[in-house]
Amino acid sequence: MSRVSQARSLGKYFLLVDNMLVVLGFFVVFPLISIRFVDQMGWAALMVGIALGLRQLVQQGLGIFGGAIADRFGAKPMIVTGMLMRAGGFAAMAVAHEPWVLWLSCILSGLGGTLFDPPRAALVVKLVRPHQRGRFFSLLMMQDSAGAVIGALLGSWLLQYDFRLVCSAGAALFIACAAFNAWYLPAWKLSTVKTPVREGLGRVLRDKRFVTYVLTLTGYYMLAVQVMLMLPIMVNDIAGSPAAVKWMYAIEATISLTLLYPIARWSEKRYRLEHRLMAGLLVMTLAMLPIGMTSSLQQLFTLICLFYIGSIIAEPARETLGASLADARARGSYMGFSRLGLAFGGALGYAGGGWLFDAGKAVGQPELPWLMLGAIGFITFLALWWQFSPKRSASGMLEPRT
């Protein structure tokens, strides 16, 4: 085995260990924020939605800058610093008794993610060959699902005693992850050339095909982020206990671990990436529409199953398509900008979803936020259909980079 092949192989194992630590640290805390502050402390869902939206907007909206800086200085210092900042955000969240404290803790957590997320994504593109990326992204998603369940179980158990224990566990995991990266991550450069920050930013912004694709995904993310806000609230409302939320993540893990990789392998040989993305989005949209009209936990979990199936169809295709459109001369910048759709969609999905949830309850129409999300899903589907139409593809606008 050549040194390059050996480095790629070891690098992939490193990425899997690193990803598991990050997922565990995240899911110990974030799925329980809405339970803690809406159900236990009686805050309006809008207040918590703003906090979650701020984290999403800061982390993903500023990701292009984090990626551009990583292109210039390398991945390691950005990743280690960002993970320590995320740990600090969790520590601040532990003492949040006013909305503004929660907002500040989420902003700090988001700033940490701004630093570590784009270079981590760029390392995947650097270390995994193009023909292997779809399968590797599927493995990461399976790991995400398993980590989400383990993290949510640990967080739910700790929440019985004290929310400060939940935040302490999340902070400890991110400190451990920072130490792991500081000790084992080589001083790899992300791009094929040492790109100045301004040049990397400009290269992305001039790439119309990539910008169009990223911004179109805003609507997709508005649906996807509800697994952190409205779906846990719905499960808690119908079940009458926050402990039921862990079963939502258990469903996700079961579906991902049993179906994600086989579906990805089967579909990558038969369908284009954009068609898989659109099919998954359509399934997610159809699952969202009737959620507000459900009255039993069995009905809700059935729709959540359908939503997760749509997600495992769409996510590997979305990640692979975004990576294939990136320019190797500015990988960090491209991966940072690719998070902008998540920034806008997350902020709108959290804050708008929280506001619609409160409004629907106030006027006696709990189905209102879900119908609106369904409409957004259909609009996004049509936008992707237009963007990837044969005529536009033939023009070369959306042909993947080699």
Curated annotation (Swiss-Prot):
Transmembrane segments: 13-33, 34-54, 99-116, 139-159, 165-185, 214-234, 243-263, 277-297, 300-320, 340-360, 368-388
One Pfam entry name: MFS_1
GO molecular-function term, one example from the UniProt record: transmembrane transporter activity
Cell compartment(s), UniProt: Cell inner membrane
GO cellular component, one term: plasma membrane
InterPro entries named in the record: MFS, MFS_dom, MFS_trans_sf, MFS_Transporters, Multidrug-R_MdtH
Membrane topology designation: Multi-pass membrane protein
Chief location category: membrane
Keywords (A to Z) from UniProt: Cell inner membrane, Cell membrane, Membrane, Transmembrane, Transmembrane helix, Transport
Family: Belongs to the major facilitator superfamily. DHA1 family. MdtH (TC 2.A.1.2.21) subfamily.
Protein name (Swiss-Prot/TrEMBL): Multidrug resistance protein MdtH
Species the sequence originates in: Klebsiella pneumoniae (strain 342)
Lineage of the organism: Bacteria, Pseudomonadati, Pseudomonadota, Gammaproteobacteria, Enterobacterales
Gene, per the UniProt record: mdtH
